[in-house]
Amino acid sequence: MDKKSLSEILNALGNEHSLTIMAVLARSECYVSELAKEVGISRPLLYLHLKKLENAGLVESEIRHFEEPPYTKKFYKAKDFQLTLSLSMIKELIKTED
């Protein structure tokens, strides 16, 4: 992992809403309206968090089409990951980039 990737992951997870989103998506995939309702935030705010989480590689999305309205829904699901962080790891990341 490089410094940029670690920063993206920590930035994406560095918020209570993002952690709640990850917990909900760890249980099951959700579409946006359903997820916003469960997390208790507006859809625009949810999209901001989802974008950060997706850019960090922590969630993925899929658009599905239906025969009845709404005809398309964007579903999100958590990607499995493990993060180990230590002071020595951070020191090594910085040293390798100098």
Question: Which functions belong to the PLM regions below?
Answer:
Residues 11-17:
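Short helix-coil-helix linker/hinge
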Residues 44:
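Key DNA-contact positions within bacterial/archaeal DNA-binding proteins
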Residues 67-98:
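Conserved segment of winged-helix/HTH DNA-binding domains
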